[in-house]
C-alpha cells in the first residue's frame, strides 16, 4: 500500500512539473532538455556538453550566444552533482525563461524518474521538451487475462503497449453424449468431473501466474472465452479469492488461444482505461457513505482536516490533485510562527494581519498546501489519495467539499475541540478562510 501511495505521489509530482514546463518559453534557443537513460555514461554527456559549448560560441547573436552558453554551463554544473547515474536515468532542464511580467529568469530542474526511461535526448530550443516525462505518466499497470474455452486456456498479461503470453495448455473434454439410459448418465457424470478438474487446473495455474510472494501481481483480471467456462471459473470456490476480487471484466470471445487473447484485449479496453476512474469512484463512494450515515469518522475542508491530522485521527487523506490553496508561514510581532491558508489570487489579505498590532506579518515561507501535504502526510500516520474531478463523485468532492477531506480512524467531534491557545489552523474570531458547504 505504501509503495502504491508513494508511486501515486511521484506521478502527481511529474504531472505538475510537466504542466509548468510545457508553459515555459524563452528567447532564442537557450532552453536545454537533456535526457540520459539508465545505462548512459555521465562522462560522455559531460564531453558532449563541452563540445556543444564550443559550437555555441560561434552563434552570431550576442544575446542568444550568451544565453545558450549560460544554459550549457548550468547543465554541466548540475550534472557534476551526480557521481553515479540514478537507476532509472536522469532528466535535466536548464535555461532562461520569460516570466509573466516579461522578465528573464534562470531555471534548472533535475528529475530522477520513478521508472526507467529508454530515450537519450539533447535539444536546445525556445521551449523544454517534456515528451519523455509525458510518456512516464501513461498507465503502465499490468492486467492479467485468462482466455478459457473447450480446447484449452491461455494466461496473458498487458502492460501499456506490451502484450505477453505467460502460459497456455490444451485440454481434451468429452463432448455431450447423444444416447439415453444409464450410459448417458455415466457420460454426463464423467463430463462434469472433467469440466470440474479443468476449472480446478485453471484456478491453480492462475495462482502460479498472477500471485507472487503471496501478493497479486496484476492491477485487475479479465476473464474471457466462449461458452460458460469463464463464468464457471468466476463463481467457483476453487478460484483464489485474492484473484476473484480482482476481476474487472468478463467478456465473450469467438476464439480461444492468442486470437481470443487479442479479441479480449480489444473488448476490455474501456474497462482497462477506467480502472483508476473506478478506484476513485469507490474511494469517494466510501467517503460519502460515512457522511450520509453520519458516522463522525469523516471531515472536510482545510480547518477540520488539518485538526484531524494533528490528532493522528486521519486514516485516508483525500485531496484534489489541482488544489491551488497556498500555505503561508508568518512571524507575528512576538516572533511566534503563524500558519494561514489562502487562494493564490486572494484579494482579501486580512489573513496576513497580526491581530495584536493590526500590522501585516512577515512572510517566512509560502508553498502550495498540496505539496506540503505530499511531503508531510506520513508524519501524521495517514495515507494520501489524489483524486480528479472527472467523475461525478470527484466533481462533487471538489465543488461541495473544497477538494480536501479525510476518512478517520475514529469519531471526532470537531465542535467540541477547544484550543487552549490560539490555534495555528483556525481563528475563531475571524472564522475560516473558506466557506465549504
Curated annotation (Swiss-Prot):
It is found in: Cytoplasm. Changing residue 180 to A: Abolished ability to mediate translation termination. Can recognize stop codons in ribosomal A-site, but is unable to catalyze peptidyl-tRNA hydrolysis. The keyword tRNA processing does not apply. N5-methylated on Gln-182 by MTQ2. The modification N5-methylglutamine is found at residue 182. InterPro entries: eFR1_2_sf, eRF1_1_Pelota, eRF1_1_sf, eRF1_2, eRF1_3, Peptide_chain-rel_eRF1/aRF1, Ribosomal_eL30-like_sf. It comes from the Eukaryota. Pfam families: eRF1_1 (PF03463), eRF1_2 (PF03464), eRF1_3 (PF03465). There is a cross-link at residue 331 (Glycyl lysine isopeptide (Lys-Gly) (interchain with G-Cter in ubiquitin)). GO terms for biological process: cytoplasmic translational termination; DNA-templated transcription termination; sno(s)RNA transcription; translational termination. The modification Phosphoserine is found at residue 421. SMART domains: eRF1_1. GO terms for cellular component: cytoplasm; cytoplasmic stress granule; cytosol; translation release factor complex. One of its GO terms (molecular function) is translation release factor activity. Component of the eRF1-eRF3-GTP ternary complex, a ternary complex that mediates translation termination in response to the termination codons. The eRF1-eRF3-GTP complex binds to a stop codon in the ribosomal A-site. SUP45/eRF1 is responsible for stop codon recognition and inducing hydrolysis of peptidyl-tRNA. Following GTP hydrolysis by SUP35/eRF3, SUP35/eRF3 dissociates, permitting SUP45/eRF1 to accommodate fully in the A-site and mediate hydrolysis of peptidyl-tRNA. Belongs to the eukaryotic release factor 1 family. Present with 13100 molecules/cell in log phase SD medium. Component of the eRF1-eRF3-GTP ternary complex, composed of SUP45/eRF1, SUP35/eRF3 and GTP. Interacts with TPA1. This is Eukaryotic peptide chain release factor subunit 1. It comes from Saccharomyces cerevisiae (strain ATCC 204508 / S288c).
Amino acid at each position: 500500500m505504501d509503495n502504491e501511495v508513494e508511486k501515486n505521489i511521484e506521478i502527481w509530482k511529474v504531472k505538475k512539473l510537466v504542466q509548468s514546463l510545457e508553459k515555459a518559453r524563452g528567447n532564442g534557443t537557450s532552453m536545454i532538455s537533456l535526457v540520459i537513460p539508465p545505462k548512459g555514461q555521465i562522462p560522455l554527456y559531460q564531453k558532449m556538453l563541452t563540445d556543444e559549448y564550443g559550437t555555441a560560441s560561434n552563434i552570431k547573436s550576442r544575446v542568444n550566444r550568451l544565453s545558450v552558453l549560460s544554459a550549457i554551463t548550468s547543465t554541466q554544473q548540475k550534472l557534476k552533482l551526480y557521481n553515479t547515474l540514478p537507476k532509472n536515468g536522469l532528466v535535466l532542464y536548464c535555461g532562461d525563461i520569460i516570466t509573466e511580467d516579461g522578465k528573464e529568469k534562470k531555471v534548472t530542474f533535475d528529475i530522477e524518474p520513478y521508472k526507467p526511461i529508454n530515450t537519450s535526448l539533447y535539444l536546445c530550443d525556445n521551449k523544454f521538451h517534456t515528451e519523455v516525462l509525458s510518456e512516464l505518466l501513461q498507465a503502465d499497470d499490468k492486467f492479467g487475462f485468462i482466455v478459457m474455452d473447450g480446447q484449452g486456456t491461455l494466461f496473458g498479461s498487458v502492460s501499456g503497449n506490451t502484450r505477453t503470453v505467460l502460459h497456455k495448455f490444451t485440454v481434451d473434454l468429452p463432448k455431450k453424449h447423444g444416447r439415453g439410459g444409464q450410459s448417458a448418465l455415466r457420460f454426463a457424470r464423467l463430463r462434469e468431473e472433467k469440466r470440474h478438474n479443468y476449472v480446478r487446473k485453471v484456478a491453480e495455474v492462475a495462482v502460479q501466474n498472477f500471485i507472487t510472494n503471496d501478493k497479486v501481481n496484476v492491477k485487475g483480471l479479465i476473464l474471457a472465452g466462449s461458452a460458460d467456462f469463464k463464468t464457471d471459473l468466476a463463481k467457483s470456490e476453487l478460484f483464489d479469492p485474492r484473484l476473484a476480487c480482482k476481476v474487472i471484466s468478463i467478456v465473450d470471445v469467438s476464439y480461444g488461444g492468442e486470437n481470443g487473447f487479442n479479441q479480449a484485449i480489444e473488448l476490455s479496453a474501456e474497462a482497462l482505461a477506467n480502472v483508476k476512474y473506478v478506484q476513485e469512484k469507490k474511494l469517494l463512494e466510501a467517503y460519502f457513505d460515512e457522511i450520509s450515515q453520519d458516522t463522525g469518522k469523516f471531515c472536510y475542508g482545510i480547518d477540520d482536516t488539518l485538526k484531524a491530522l494533528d490528532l493522528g485521527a486521519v486514516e485516508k487523506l483525500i485531496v484534489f490533485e489541482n488544489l491551488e490553496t497556498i500555505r503561508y508561514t508568518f512571524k507575528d510581532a512576538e516572533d511566534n510562527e503563524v500558519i494561514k491558508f489562502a487562494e493564490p489570487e486572494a484579494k482579501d489579505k486580512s489573513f496576513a494581519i497580526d491581530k495584536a498590532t493590526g500590522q501585516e506579518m512577515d512572510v517566512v515561507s509560502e508553498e502550495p498546501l498540496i505539496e506540503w501535504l505530499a511531503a508531510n502526510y506520513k508524519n501524521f500516520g495517514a495515507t494520501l489519495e489524489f483524486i480528479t474531478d472527472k467523475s461525478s463523485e470527484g466533481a462533487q468532492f471538489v465543488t461541495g467539499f473544497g477538494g480536501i477531506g479525510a476518512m478517520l480512524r475514529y469519531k471526532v467531534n470537531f465542535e467540541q475541540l477547544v484550543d487552549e491557545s490560539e490555534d495555528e489552523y483556525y481563528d475563531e474570531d475571524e472564522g475560516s478562510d473558506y466557506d465549504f458547504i
